Each structure stands twice: as structure tokens, then as C-alpha cells.
Swiss-Prot record:
The gene is ube2m. It catalyses: [E1 NEDD8-activating enzyme]-S-[NEDD8 protein]-yl-L-cysteine + [E2 NEDD8-conjugating enzyme]-L-cysteine = [E1 NEDD8-activating enzyme]-L-cysteine + [E2 NEDD8-conjugating enzyme]-S-[NEDD8-protein]-yl-L-cysteine. It comes from Xenopus tropicalis. The lineage of its organism: Eukaryota, Metazoa, Chordata, Craniata, Vertebrata. The acetylation of Met-1 increases affinity for DCUN1D1 by about 2 orders of magnitude and is crucial for NEDD8 transfer to cullins. Its EC number is 2.3.2.34. This is NEDD8-conjugating enzyme Ubc12. Residues 29-173 form the UBC core domain.
Amino acid sequence: MIKLFSLKQQKKEEESAGGTKGSSKKASAAQLRIQKDINELNLPKTCEIEFSDHDDLLNFKLVICPDEGFYKGGKFVFSFKVGQGYPHDPPKVKCETMVYHPNIDLEGNVCLNILREDWKPVLTINSIIYGLQYLFLEPNPEDPLNKEAAEVLQNNRRLFEQNVQRSMRGGYIGSTYFERCLK
């Protein structure tokens, strides 16, 4: 019993000592979970995470550089905004690189089932990263956000590949201009 009391007293003293330096804010559940997710990241060699503010783990960028498939040689940047409802609510993920892709629209919205109806709190940032990487390896024309790209992929894979290459080099597809995104 005395040991328990001394542990409580020690903790109280540590908290009050920390309180004199400035008000210490308790980490939210979302912050604790994102810290755990980041610590347990197992990034593939084609991905890298960038934090503009190392004290803010709730906002970061993911860079994917596919090394195979239609998008090989491209560099695609995604922004992650993790809300206070995480892990019960999925993070908001946007593609900042304009890309000709059936599952990413021209505004950067991403069609990935685990970011919507199939989200579960047991999923992690790592799950999302692998899901995004898979979209570049296997674009899904069955669930498109960019219907025009999906139709071309379904009807003429060669033309789709040419359009992807043209867009990544920097050029027009129809009336839409794509900035160069090759590494």
C-alpha cells in the first residue's frame, strides 16, 4: 500500500514540476493512436512520409513513386488530415498531384473503399498507404471517380497507357492540362 501511495505521490510531483514550465496539454486519443501508427509504419521502398511540422502528427504528406505499372516513374503527393475522431473516423486523404487515374478525380479526391464505407478503427495509416499504392499498381475502373479515364482503361488499355504517360510528362488529355510529375 505504501508503494502505491509513493508512486501516486511521485506522479503528482512530476505533473506539478511539468506544470511550472507551462501548461502541459494531454494528448488526445487521436494523437496517441496516430503516434502509435507512425511508430509502427512499415513503408514500402516506393513511399515516404513528410511532416512539415514534427510536432503535428495529425497533418502530413505521403509521397508515392511507383516502380512498376502504368504510373512507373511518377511522383504523387497525398495530404493526410487526421481528425480528432480518429481512429473511429478515417483520415481525410487528398491527392495533391493532378493525375489521370480512374480512382482519383481532378480535384484530388480519392476513391478507396477503406477511406469510406469499409473504414474500421482497427485499420491504420499503414493500411491506407498500402491501399493507395495498390491503386497505382491496379487502377479499378469498376468504382471510378474519373469516369472518362475508367472508360478508356476498360475499352482501350493501350490508349489509357499513352494518356497516363502524356499526363505524367506534362501535357493535355482532352482539354485538361496535367503538370509534369515524373521523378
